[in-house]
Amino acid sequence: MLTVPYLWKGAQAFPVADVTFEAARSPLTVKALVDSGASFSVFRAEVLECLRIPLSHGRRLYLEGIGGRILGYLHRLPVRVGGVRFPLTVVFSQELAVSFNLLGRDNFFHNFLVTFDERRRETRLQAYRSHHTARVI
């Protein structure tokens, strides 16, 4: 089980996790908000630029949410969170207007039992060992 302390930004604490993309010659680790209210994982397009993957190589789609409608490109990339490797389906967008990349329910939450402990200000991620796409290392 991975226990991750919340990240403090000013006076607020947020449940974040390190996500390591393994699609490049050298792995790239970024922080993302573990967001049970997000249907999909949505990351800034700059992450793809660092991985040297063209944004347009993904499937073009529009997402709608509280902040309005944004254009994004759907990609499926190998990632590692804690000691678990799995393919993450993620939408990359140049129009993402929130301060964090988002790990949403579709695909990410299928790999972990997620517990938000507000009192301790930490997130616990317990891998589902029987899941066919996740591999604990």
Which residues does each predicted region cover?
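Pepsin/retropepsin-fold aspartyl endopeptidases
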Residues: 1-137
